UniProtKB/Swiss-Prot annotation:
One GO process term, biological-process aspect: protoporphyrinogen IX biosynthetic process
Name of this chain's protein: Oxygen-dependent coproporphyrinogen-III oxidase
Stretch list, region Important for dimerization: 240-275
Main subcellular location: cytoplasm
InterPro entries found in the cross-reference section: Coprogen_oxidase_aer, Coprogen_oxidase_aer_sf, Coprogen_oxidase_CS
Annotated pathway: Porphyrin-containing compound metabolism; protoporphyrin-IX biosynthesis; protoporphyrinogen-IX from coproporphyrinogen-III (O2 route): step 1/1
Quaternary context: Homodimer.
Organism field: Salmonella dublin (strain CT_02021853)
Keyword vocabulary terms for this entry: Cytoplasm, Heme biosynthesis, Metal-binding, Oxidoreductase, Porphyrin biosynthesis
Length: 299
C-alpha cells in the first residue's frame, strides 16, 4: 500500500483523544485545549492538564504541519528532500506527577512524508516512549519494559532489543554522563518493509503507552511523600530540562525552524530546582537512583 497521510492523521487524532481520556479518568481533572494554526501551513491541538489530583502537569500535543518546501536546516542533512512539498504530523506528550514515587513519562509517535511530481514519496515513521523515575521500583521497570517487549514481539524478535538500545543511547546526558531514566523504546526513519507494516508498529507504540504507564501510576499514587521526596523530585527534574534544551533533537529542531514555542516547551516541568554540587546522603533512597537508572536488561 502506498503511504496514506490521511489515515495516519486520523489515527493520531484518535490517539490524542484516547490518551487524554484515560489520563483524565485516572486523575479526575480535565484537559484544556488550545487549537492553533501555523501561518505557513497546518496547525494543531495542544492539551494541558494542570494541578490535577495526581498529575501536576500533563501535556498531550497533536500537530500537523505542511509546506511547499523543507527548511534549509532539514535539507542540509537530507539533500533528497530538496524541492519537495512535505507533511509532518505527530502526537507527543509528557506527564509530570505530583507524587515523587510516580515516574515522569514521555511518549511520541510521528510521521513524515515529502513528495514531488514524478518521483516516489520519501516517508518515515518515528517515536517511542521512556520513563523517568525519581525513586526506583524494580517491578515498575519490569512492567514498563515487558509491555514494550510484548508490543514489539509481533514485528520480530530483534525489534525490542534494537529499539531499547536506541532509547538508552538517545536519552543520555553527555554533560552529566548519566541516563535520563530507565528508557523504553525509541525508533526513527522507519520505512521498511512497507507502509502498512510501519504504520501498524507506530500504532502499537502509541496505543501501548497507557498500558505501560497507568498501572505504575495506580500502584504508586497512594504512597505517602514529604518535603524530602519533593525536593529530590524537583532536583531531578532539572536533568529533564537539561536534556530537552541541550540534547533533544525534536526540541532543537522545532525551536530552530520557527515551530510553535508554547507547544514545544509544553514538556517542561512546572517547577524545578538546581543546587550547586548537591550530593545525596550515602545509603539513602535518593542515592540509590544513580544505580537504578544504569542501562540493564530489565526482562
Amino acid at each position: 500500500m502506498k503511504p496514506d497521510a490521511h489515515h495516519v492523521k486520523q489515527f493520531l487524532l484518535r490517539l490524542q483523544d484516547d490518551i487524554c481520556q484515560k489520563l483524565s479518568a485516572v486523575d479526575g481533572a480535565n484537559f484544556v485545549e488550545d487549537s492553533w494554526r501555523r501561518e505557513a501551513g497546518g496547525g494543531g491541538r495542544s492539551r494541558v492538564l494542570r494541578n490535577g489530583g495526581i498529575f501536576e502537569q500533563a501535556g498531550v500535543n497533536f500537530s500537523h504541519v505542511h509546506g511547499d518546501a523543507m527548511p534549509a536546516s532539514a535539507t542540509a542533512h537530507r539533500p533528497e528532500l530538496a524541492g519537495r512539498s512535505f507533511e509532518a504530523m505527530g502526537v507527543s506528550l509528557v506527564v509530570h506527577p505530583h507524587n515523587p514515587y510516580i515516574p515522569t513519562s514521555h511518549a511520541n509517535v510521528r510521521f513524515f512524508i515529502a513528495e514531488k511530481p514524478g518521483a516516489d514519496p520519501v516517508w518515515w515513521f518515528g517515536g517511542g516512549f521512556d520513563l523517568t523515575p525519581y525513586y526506583g521500583f524494580e517491578e515498575d521497570a519490569v512492567h514498563w519494559h515487558r509491555t514494550a517487549r510484548d508490543l514489539c514481539q509481533p514485528f520480530g524478535d530483534d525489534v525490542y532489543p534494537r529499539y531499547k538500545k536506541w532509547c538508552d543511547d538517545y536519552f543520555f546526558l553527555k554533560h552529566r554522563n548519566e541516563q535520563r531514566g530507565i528508557g523504553g523504546l525509541f525508533f526513527d526513519d522507519l520505512n521498511t518493509p512497507d507502509f502498512d507494516h510501519c504504520f501498524a508498529f507506530m500504532q502499537a507504540v502509541g496505543n501501548g503507552y497507557t498500558e505501560a504507564y497507568l498501572p505504575i501510576v495506580e500502584r504508586r499514587k497512594a504512597m505517602v511523600w514529604g518535603e524530602r521526596e519533593r525536593n529530590f523530585q524537583l532536583y531531578r527534574r532539572g536533568r529533564y530540562v537539561e536534556f530537552n534544551l541541550v540534547w533533544d533533537r525534536g526540541t532543537l529542531f522545532g525551536l530552530q525552524t520557527g515551530g510553535r514555542t508554547e507547544s514545544i516547551l509544553m514538556s517542561m516541568p512546572p517547577l524545578v530546582r538546581w543546587e550547586y554540587d548537591w550530593q545525596p546522603e550515602a545509603g539513602s533512597p535518593e542515592a540509590a537512583l544513580s544505580e537504578f537508572i544504569q542501562v540493564r536488561d530489565w526482562i
